[in-house]
Amino acid sequence: PTTTNTVDFHSAAYFLRYSNTLQVVRETDSDAKNSFAVNSFGTATAQAINNKTAFENATIDSSDGAFIGRFPGSLGNSLQVSICGSSDSDGSGVINFNAWAYKSSFDAAPGTSSYVSGLGGKNDEIHVAVIDEDGEISGTAGTVLEAYPFLSVASNAKATDGTSNYYKDVIRE
C-alpha cells in the first residue's frame, strides 16, 4: 500500500481475514471513454464500454478502429500496440522482424501456422506487442506489457490445442 490507498487497502485486507471473496467496484465519470487506436483511414469516435460483457458484445467496425481499450479511463492512453507480420520488409509496409524494436520479446520471426500450412496457405502469423508507451502503467516508458507470439490473421485458425489462434480472439481474452 501507498499513502494514497492505505485506508482502502487495509480495509480490504481486514475484510479478507474473515471472508474469502471481495468485490471491487470502480466508478467512472459519465464522460469517460475507452482509449482506441484509429486506422489511418478510420473515422471512429470515442465511446464508453463500461464492462467486460459490454466489451464482448460491442460491434466495432474494424475499418474505423484497430484496437480499443477494454475499460474506460485515461490510463489506456499510455498503451501502444505494435504488430510484426510474417513477411519481411517487401515494400508493402510490413515491419521487418530483425529491425523491429520488440524483437527481443519473441523467440523467432512469425511465419506460417501449422493450421494454415495444412490448408495450403502461408504467411498468416503475426506477433503483437502491447507496450506502456508513456510509462503510466509500469512506471517505465517502453515496457512490453504483453507479448502475443505466432497469432494468425486467418479468422478460422486453430492452435495445436484446438483453441482459436485468430489474433482478435486471443487478444480479446
Spans of features found by a protein language model:
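Surface-exposed assembly/interface segments
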Residues: 1-173
